[in-house]
Amino acid sequence: MLIKFFVSAANNGYLNGLANEFNESTNSIRKELNNLSEAGYLLKSKKNNRIIYNANTAHPMFGILQKIVRQHLGLQEIVETVIERIGDVDQIALTGEYAKGIDSGNIEIIINGLKVNNDYLEKIKPKIKKKIGRDVSFLLNHKIDSNTIVLYTKTN
């Protein structure tokens, strides 16, 4: 559940939706949501007769928890590898299931830039998988929209 809320501050969820998503009972999800809310990690808001939960970005531990989640997923290693060896990268973003906070086993990364070495990307996929234990898909020069999480933006 931490992945859901801390991979991106924009992610949110409600009790029944989370129970379905995680294939767990509503009672176990409720207990976990209450524990995280009482500790201050999650905020609650009411919308259309539903209680919506999202990460408390003002919590002193938010940045640390987000960094831990991203390290757990192997995102930092992917970003560093891409920036160092792939070419002239302008932006790197997370998309797909992981951007929604769902640990599906396949990380989808958008890489936008000039002269990006696609052959090298294909070559390093097995190495990344071995290192982080997840499949990685690279999408070159795709649109970054509201469903993506920007991991890196080139500064001039």
Which residues fall in each region the model found?
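Catalytic core of pol beta-like nucleotidyltransferases
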Residues: 2-88, 98-104, 114-156
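Hydrophobic/anchoring residues in structured secondary elements
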Residues: 91-94
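Short hydrophobic/aromatic beta-strand micro-patches
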Residues: 110-112
